[in-house]
From Swiss-Prot:
One of its GO terms (biological process) is 1-deoxy-D-xylulose 5-phosphate biosynthetic process. Binds 1 Mg(2+) ion per subunit. Binds 1 thiamine pyrophosphate per subunit. This is 1-deoxy-D-xylulose-5-phosphate synthase. The gene is dxs. Catalyzes the acyloin condensation reaction between C atoms 2 and 3 of pyruvate and glyceraldehyde 3-phosphate to yield 1-deoxy-D-xylulose-5-phosphate (DXP). Thiamine diphosphate binds at residues 87, 128-130, 160-161, 188, 295, 377. Its cofactor is Mg(2+); thiamine diphosphate. Mg(2+) binds at residues 159, 188. Pathway: Metabolic intermediate biosynthesis; 1-deoxy-D-xylulose 5-phosphate biosynthesis; 1-deoxy-D-xylulose 5-phosphate from D-glyceraldehyde 3-phosphate and pyruvate: step 1/1.
Length: 631
């Protein structure tokens, strides 16, 4: 196996066993003795594929053996296999007939980064966000029972995703309906237990065997007539298992817990899965894997190698780097540290996005004021509300797509009480190769309808810094939404001064056409304006809208064009139209933004072009409307 990033194979490896196992049916025709060799080949194939395309990396390497075992033991796709999040699903895709399409992974018109129902019958449930798998698999298990079907339902969930409340809601419900289903905990961080080894593997085989299960069920029937005796027996079994395994919590929730077992020991996993396949009721298997297994750098640094960029040809000349500014997330991270130094009331909260949201430096400088709540967006928002009640100034750093999961808390716990909580909303707009499940397409629409909410859209790095200060000093809930990637390299002021709330600024004076920009399309708008002599306005605030400026522009221009990287429906442009209608002002409007579709994965520039939000698309749309109006 390669030991450095540059040693990842650039040519497809020779894989005679994998060539015969490109579908689960082919896999099941292999001898069990061949499967460990198959695992080696699949791991090499995954290294090669992701090296060519880039993408999620470490999680897939860690579940090679588990993926093989699941498809070997269960009759997929008839048996329903649900992967949580989907970061670990690349080996699954390779083994389910998509090997020859893997080089199109995450590319325009190629296969998706996550399981998609429309892509394969083996992808039984579309994912991207975490902690949904148990609920989905439970729904499938109940449906199978109602249809008198014997098909199995299996959910594979990671230890990180198991921190979310939704997962425990499903675990609790499954025992209530006594669902025949299997949950597999893929523990790749050892956050639950380190008790893995020969004794644990041996115990798992015993506890999952039909003999043990039949004895257990027989005893239950007899002792159920003697409630006191049954409760003593149940507790005795639970405590005996608890001395060797960490499953007491799951047993208390009504699940038959097995494990932990070594997730890279194929014979043990296959034997255990075969034993558990026909057991009735909720079954829980705990497997321990190593993220990045088989690639030393990823084993050492699983966070850094969570995803990788594609390998470039060794002889490819270095392309000249385009001038660009810092990442917007880095600007936020620096502001957070600066404001924390100036205001000791500030606290930082994130739902498991420390690195992505650039909170590393803040967490190191102010550990007592930093709170990573894990994958628990609802809790993160209400935690912030509680802190704000006591005089703290919480900053919730969260991706736009994940804030959707805490919308009730945003309204009920923060906004209704008019609490001082600042939402730093990263990854707003289109995010590229991860596709529609990760796009921040709706935040302006779902934020601007909330009374008292301050909503801001920076056009560059300096505007972001000023808006963060504005939101921090605002008396009430505030949101600043900014995109993934780098800014246009605008000079950044070192101060912490706020903006005047609700005031936009004219960046270029033109005539006839006014381009009202909400966010980072300002550079494209200025470029287009040079071709048509348009006025360009950096609106800055979606809420409160600069109504005086909108009226002024409507009175002096023949066409108003709104620009935003948000859904057109209910977005910033809609706010302009609603205001003009409320004032009985009739004015031609053109709203440019994200259409009423899910924009599929591609490079960000390709996605913007598809939506007509690049300079060429904006210019074409505006000129077409001008021609229609005779301008």
């Amino acid at each position: 196996m390669p030991t450095t990033f540059q040693e990842i194979p650039r040519e497809r490896p020779v894989t005679p066993l994998l060539d015969r196992a490109d579908t689960p049916a082919g896999l099941r025709r292999l001898a069990e003795a061949d499967l460990e060799h198959l695992a080696d080949e699949l791991r090499q194939e995954l290294l090669y594929t992701v090296g060519q395309t880039g993408g999620h990396f470490g999680a897939g390497l860690g579940v090679i053996e588990l993926t093989i075992a699941l498809h070997y033991v269960f009759d997929t796709p008839d048996d329903r296999l649900v992967w949580d999040v989907g970061h670990q699903a690349y080996p699954h895709k390779i083994l389910t007939g998509r090997r020859n399409r893997m080089l199109s992974l995450r590319q325009k018109d190629g296969i998706a980064a996550f399981p998609r129902r429309s892509e394969s019958e083996y992808d039984t449930f579309g994912v991207g966000h975490s902690s949904t798998s148990i609920s989905a698999a439970l729904g499938m298990a109940i449906a199978a029972r109602l249809q008198n079907s014997a098909r199995k339902s299996i959910a594979v969930i990671g230890d990180g995703a198991l921190t979310a409340g939704m997962a425990f809601e499903a675990l609790n419900h499954a025992q209530e309906v006594n669902a025949d289903m299997l949950v597999i905990l893929n523990d790749n961080d050892m956050s639950i237990s380190r008790n893995v080894g020969g004794l644990s593997n041996y115990l798992a085989k015993i506890l999952s065997s039909r003999t043990y299960a039949s004895m257990r069920e027989g005893s239950k029937k007899v002792l159920s007539r003697l409630p006191g005796a049954w409760e003593i027996a149940r507790r005795t079994e639970e405590y005996a298992k608890g001395m060797l395994v960490p499953g007491t919590l799951f047993e208390e929730l009504g699940w038959n817990y097995i494990g932990p077992i070594d997730g890279h020991d194929l014979p043990t996993m296959i034997a255990t899965l075969r034993n558990m396949r026909d057991l009735k009721g909720p079954q829980f298997l705990h497997v321990v894997t190593k993220k990045g297994k088989g690639f030393a750098p990823a084993e050492i640094d699983p966070i850094g190698y969570h995803a990788i960029t594609k390998l470039e040809p060794a002889d490819k000349p270095a392309a000249p780097k385009k001038a660009s500014g810092p990442k917007y997330s880095a600007v936020f991270g620096q502001w957070l540290c600066d404001m924390a130094a100036a205001d000791n009331r500030l606290v930082g909260i994130t739902p498991a996005m420390k690195e992505g949201s650039d909170l590393v430096a803040f967490s190191e400088r102010y550990p007592e004021r930093y709170f990573d709540v894990a994958i628990a967006e609802q809790h993160a928002v209400t935690l912030a509300a509680g802190m704000a009640c006591e005089g703290s100034k919480p900053v919730v750093a969260i991706y736009s797509t994940f804030l959707q999961r805490a919308y009730d808390q945003l309204i009920h716990d923060v906004a209704v009480q008019n609490l001082d909580v600042l939402f730093a909303i990263d990854r707003a707009g289109l995010v590229g190769e991860d596709g529609p499940t990760h796009a921040g397409s709706y935040d302006l629409s779902y934020l601007r309808c909330i009374p008292g909410m301050l909503v801001m859209t920076p056009s560059d790095e300096n505007e972001l810094r000023k808006m963060l200060s504005t939101g921090h000093l605002y008396n009430g809930p505030a949101a600043v939404r900014y995109p993934r990637g780098t800014g246009p390299n605008a000079p950044i002021s070192g101060d912490l001064e706020p903006l005047e709330i609700g005031k936009g600024v004219i960046r270029r004076q033109g005539e006839k056409v006014a381009l009202l920009v909400f966010g980072v399309q300002l550079a494209e708008a200025l470029q287009v304006a040079e071709q048509i002599n348009a006025t360009v306005v950096d609106m800055r605030f979606v809420k409160p809208l600069d109504e005086a400026l909108v009226l002024e522009l409507a009175g002096s221009h023949a066409l108003l064009v709104t620009l935003e990287e948000n859904a057109i429906m209910g977005g910033a442009g809609a706010a302009v139209g609603e205001f003009l209608a409320s004032q009985a002002v009739i004015k031609p409007l053109l709203h440019l933004g994200l259409p009423d579709i899910y924009v599929e994965h591609a490079k960000p520039a390709q996605m913007l072009a598809e939506c007509g939000l690049d300079a060429a698309g904006i210019e074409a749309s505006v000129k077409a409307r001008m021609a229609k109006l005779g301008l």
